[in-house]
Amino acid sequence: MKLNGVFTALATPFRDDLSLDERALASFVDWQISSGISGIVPCGTTGESATLNFEEYCTVVRLCIETARGRILVIAGAGSHCTTETISRALFVQSAGADAALIVVPYYNRPSDEGVYQHFRAVHDATNIPIVLYNVPQRTAIDISNDTIRRIAELPRVVGIKDCTGAERVAALKAILPEKVAILSGEDETALASYMNGGSGCISVVSNVAPKMAVELYRLHALGKINMAKQVSGNLAALSRVLFIEPSPSPTKYALSLMGKMRPKVRLPLVELTSSGQTAVKNVLETLDLLRQQKAMHSQL
């Protein structure tokens, strides 16, 4: 498996009573597919996986796989700070038919680099599914070394890394990782720089709201149209900044509510966007013409 392109870190729709909105989720996945993305990543940070019980987690993963129907890749979040729990989740996504499992570096425990390696090796050896390593020190309080990333990447079924430490690291990782391992940016603001340094794609939050724009950035870079890509990257960066103006995914869900994709509901301890945050998000969506485009699309249906 070679991972290339834009993969949406999928938001999870909730109803007003905060139960899963399965109909909205299926519709959202279909819209993502029609917008040209390469894959979806359900049950990650943006999907509020920390607030889903195991039954809900299984429902979201199954529904994404069933809706995708092989048209795009499904890389299901399966990480935890507990190795046995991570193995259980990885075995589930394997049995459900996911294309790969996204495994985050264990958080809260703050293990050593050797502990992180042994965690990934245990998950790898207990399963038979391709694995994408997720390095996000902003949330785990651990930034594992390049050498440890290399050791993990040498495990046979590790096929990618989602790295959120900046585009500067991509070239260094590219030089030491096996060819089979894709380097995926975890930051929309630096996605273009990551591509230019040898990155294979992006696991994107912004593509929840502007999937066509995120795909266009990837396409323009692939075609060598760097000046045009820089213009698109500037727009995506502005959108990315406002989608993190308050704790994510509250701004993303509010943006999607304006676009008619899902309610703005989030589960505690997250709260819905403040009025000032709502104004900021709406202003950026209007500046980028995303609301008008969405209304025009609905009028054609």
Curated annotation (Swiss-Prot):
The active site is at Y134, K162. Pathway: Amino-acid biosynthesis; L-lysine biosynthesis via DAP pathway; (S)-tetrahydrodipicolinate from L-aspartate: step 3/4. GO terms for biological process: diaminopimelate biosynthetic process; lysine biosynthetic process via diaminopimelate. GO terms for molecular function: 4-hydroxy-tetrahydrodipicolinate synthase activity. InterPro entries: Aldolase_TIM, DapA, DapA-like, Schiff_base-form_aldolases_AS, Schiff_base-form_aldolases_CS. Its EC number is 4.3.3.7. The record marks T45, Y108 as: Part of a proton relay during catalysis. It holds the Pfam family DHDPS. SUPFAM superfamilies: Aldolase. It is an enzyme of class 4 (lyase). One of its GO terms (cellular component) is cytosol. Pyruvate binds at T46, I203. Keywords: Amino-acid biosynthesis, Cytoplasm, Diaminopimelate biosynthesis, Lyase, Lysine biosynthesis, Schiff base. Transmembrane segments: none annotated. Its main location: cytoplasm. Belongs to the DapA family. Catalyzes the condensation of (S)-aspartate-beta-semialdehyde [(S)-ASA] and pyruvate to 4-hydroxy-tetrahydrodipicolinate (HTPA). Homotetramer; dimer of dimers. PANTHER family: 4-HYDROXY-2-OXOGLUTARATE ALDOLASE, MITOCHONDRIAL, DIHYDRODIPICOLINATE SYNTHASE. This is 4-hydroxy-tetrahydrodipicolinate synthase. It comes from Anaplasma marginale (strain St. Maries).
